[in-house]
């Protein structure tokens, strides 16, 4: 099985694994060949959500949005891991969270390939999407986009093209942290546009964000 990294990138990550072994995205314990830390697994189970959360599109005027899903509540070890990925430069944490998201939402079995967690391919017949699009970052100062890193294993497992440049942010807006659902929707309204419309026009898009 091939992973979702190019060969040079995979070799570079293998070298880093020798010096800096894989760690749990929640508590940073060394994982070895385990997909998740045995200590944090029950903590994650406590934060699990239902498989799909349907939005009231008539209330929020999101007619183009079919639904939304989150594998975990944004609390505890999940919140800590996402904040480290966003603000402490732990890009690897974003990838590990993406692997876990893929396993929880789509039932992909995670295997180890050259010391990397790789979700097994999921049958495309039951997926119903044409592409995976990560939400653009508010700032590029961290050097990477957290939703894009999370979307990499997801796109691999679903055998879908990952389109990181399909959307662009046209205004920064306020930080979403601490905002209510209605405030988040108002804050995000008009903040993005299709940078390359031909990539997503008429497509069923699986949009990925970190929170």
Task: Label each PLM-derived region with a short phrase.
Residues 1-211:
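Glycine-rich phosphate/pyrophosphate-handling loop used in enzymes and phosphotransfer proteins
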């Amino acid at each position: 099985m091939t992973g979702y990294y190019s060969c040079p990138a995979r070799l570079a990550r293998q070298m880093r694994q020798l010096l800096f072994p894989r760690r749990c995205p929640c508590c940073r314990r060394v994982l070895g060949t385990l997909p998740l830390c045995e200590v944090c697994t029950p903590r994650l189970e406590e934060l699990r959500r239902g498989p799909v959360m349907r939005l009231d599109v008539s209330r929020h005027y999101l007619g183009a949005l079919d639904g939304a899903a989150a594998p975990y509540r944004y609390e505890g070890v999940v919140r800590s891991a996402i904040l480290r990925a966003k603000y402490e430069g732990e890009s690897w944490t974003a990838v590990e969270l993406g692997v876990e998201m893929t396993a929880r939402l789509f039932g992909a079995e995670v295997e180890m390939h050259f010391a990397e967690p790789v979700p097994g391919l999921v049958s495309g017949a039951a997926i119903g999407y044409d592409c995976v699009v990560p939400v653009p970052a508010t700032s590029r100062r961290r050097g990477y986009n957290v939703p894009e890193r999370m979307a990499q294993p997801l796109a691999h497992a679903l055998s879908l093209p990952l389109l990181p440049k399909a959307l662009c942010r046209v205004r920064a807006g306020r930080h979403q942290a601490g905002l209510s659902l209605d405030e988040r929707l108002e804050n995000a309204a008009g903040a993005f546009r299709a940078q390359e419309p031909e990539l997503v026009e008429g497509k069923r898009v699986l949009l990925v964000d970190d929170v």
